[in-house]
């Protein structure tokens, strides 16, 4: 069952299932979350992650995979 993503908003912290920081929400674009490029984890680029990875969104967006795995699989935005 997919998580309710309606509570996700700009500047929410995104963490992995291990509680480690992944990024900060810039915006949601359909079924994709765009992370800010100014975040310390971003390397100065926007990255995109699918909303399918969201486990919960209650003040913090928690993913269903550890931070390192999410960061190795995210897509850099053009």
What does each model-identified segment do?
Residues 1-78:
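Peripheral interaction segments used for macromolecular assembly
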């Amino acid at each position: 069952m997919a998580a309710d993503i309606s509570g996700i908003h700009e500047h929410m912290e995104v963490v992995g299932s291990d509680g480690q920081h992944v990024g900060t929400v810039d915006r949601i674009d359909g079924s994709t979350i765009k992370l800010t490029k100014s975040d310390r984890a971003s390397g100065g680029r926007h990255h995109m992650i699918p909303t399918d990875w969201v486990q919960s969104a209650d003040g913090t967006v928690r993913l269903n995979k550890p931070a390192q795995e999410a960061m190795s699989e995210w897509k850099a935005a053009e």
